Every structure is written in structure tokens, then in C-alpha cells.
């Protein structure tokens, strides 16, 4: 910690980079809170960028942790709206969101903003039909709205003229060179 404090005070970039590398090497989901606070204190943005990228690229793994369940609605929505998010399927993502919600039902106020970022249009018609039977989905009207929009997309797709929306776009990052 003394090296980090001195490096920050003297603005020795090479030493700060080494400290960032060291913190990144220690970073896990379990200790992220503490290490990210240290990185934030010393403006080690590479550490927070690394952690964000780690979550985005291993999101399915992240959803199995206590740290996922501890996210606020705005934090979760921030990850979900990112096109760099890697998920096995949007259905698996929906199920993870329901686990997150059931962990603390006071999050009902955040559920609309979180579900807004699920790409329901990428689910199959069978998956959408199953979701409409889900008790939680039936009681939360915004979810039904998103599902019905996705069903409309599939109907239009079958006719050959789908209206493309964020809900039907594949998650991908376009790099400019």
C-alpha cells in the first residue's frame, strides 16, 4: 500500500501500472469491492475497466455469485445495456434476473429498467410462450409488454418484414479500426 501511495503522490506512471497489474492479478468476484475501492481511491481506471470487462465477458459465471445478487438495479441495468455482454442465451439472462429479483423483492421498483435490456426478440417463440406462463411474468405487466413485443417481432419475421428494435438485435461490439 505504501508503494501505491508513493507512486500516486509522485505520479510515477510505471509504478502505478505495476500496482494496477498486481491488483488485477488478485481480483476476484469475492474481493472486488475492496480492491475496486482502492483502485478508485488512486484513480487506477485500468483496474475498474478490467473488472467491468471480466463481468461482461463471463456474465453467466458472474450470475452464480453473491456479488451478482448484491448489485443495485442501476448497476445491473448498466451491464445489461452493454452490447459487449456475453450471455449463453437471453432466456438464461431472464432467469438470472428473476433470481436477482427474488433475492430482494423490494427491487420491484428496478425490475422494469432491468428487464428493458433483455433481448426478448432473440428468444424462440417457444421460450416466449413458456415465459407467459411464469407466475412472476404474469404479475409484472412490463414483462408481459416486452414479451408481447417480441411475439409481434416473431410474427412479423415469419411474414418477412420484421421491425428491428434493440430487443431483437444480437449483442455484439463493432470495432472501428
Specify the residue positions occupied by each region the protein language model found.
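Alpha-helical scaffold in the C-terminal half of BTB/POZ domains
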Residues: 1-177
Amino acid at each position: 500500500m505504501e508503494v501505491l501511495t508513493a507512486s500516486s503522490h509522485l505520479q510515477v506512471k510505471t509504478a502505478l501500472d505495476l500496482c494496477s497489474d498486481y491488483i488485477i492479478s488478485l481480483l476476484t468476484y469475492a474481493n472486488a469491492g475492496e480492491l475496486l475501492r482502492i483502485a478508485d481511491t488512486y484513480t487506477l481506471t485500468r483496474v475498474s475497466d478490467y473488472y467491468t470487462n471480466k463481468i461482461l465477458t463471463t456474465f453467466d459465471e458472474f450470475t452464480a455469485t453473491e456479488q451478482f445478487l448484491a448489485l443495485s438495479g442501476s448497476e445491473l441495468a448498466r451491464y445489461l445495456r452493454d452490447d459487449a455482454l456475453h450471455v449463453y442465451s437471453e432466456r438464461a439472462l431472464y432467469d438470472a434476473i428473476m433470481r436477482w429479483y427474488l433475492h430482494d423483492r423490494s427491487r420491484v421498483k428496478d425490475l422494469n429498467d432491468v428487464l428493458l435490456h433483455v433481448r426478448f426478440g432473440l428468444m424462440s417463440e417457444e421460450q416466449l410462450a413458456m415465459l407467459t406462463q411464469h407466475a412472476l411474468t404474469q404479475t409484472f405487466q412490463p414483462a408481459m409488454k416486452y414479451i408481447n413485443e417480441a411475439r409481434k417481432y416473431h410474427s412479423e419475421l415469419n411474414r418477412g418484414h420484421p421491425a428491428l428494435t434493440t430487443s431483437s438485435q444480437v449483442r455484439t461490439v463493432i470495432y472501428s479500426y
